[in-house]
Amino acid sequence: LTPASASVATGVNITASAVTGINGGAGFQTTDVGRIISFNSGKAKITSRTNTTVVVCTITTAFTNTNATEAFNLGAFSDTTGHPSCVSFFEQRLVFAGTTDEPQTLFFSKAGDYENMTTGTNADDAMVYTIASNQVNAIRYMKAVRTLVVGTTGGEFTVSADGTDAAVTPSNVTIKKQSSYGSSTVDAVPAGN
């Protein structure tokens, strides 16, 4: 991707040299409007689509330069990829889950900074985890108790810190299957302790 400008501005074209790596090789779609693009230490919000290789954006965080790069990220939530089907708070993090493209993926915000979804390796950084399973387990609900209980179409899972009583961080998340009953879209109700 190459931005026409590196500064915070509106109406800036961002051009891709090819559709490779954009929406599974389909390039930019009209449903990408509103989606965030991040690269070169900056961020831009897509405001319109010109064609499969050009989008018009509002740069919200300045890019370090206007050099072309193949290292970029498109925001996970959009009309193209789907929006989260459930949301919860867990250990001072806002957690989204269950998009159309990533039905068994959990998106955790930065601890105490609910709008910051920038992943990293620091203990308080945002993180993204996908439930590993032999089948697609679309997430139906999440319930925060001592652990984050995640109900999916194929079973129930818990998300917690790796064998400790510590808070979850990008380096210690454990996701364990608890049962194989499967869940509906009805929210869980805690019973007992």
Range-by-range predicted roles:
Residues 73-93, 98-193:
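Beta-propeller and closely related beta-pinwheel folds
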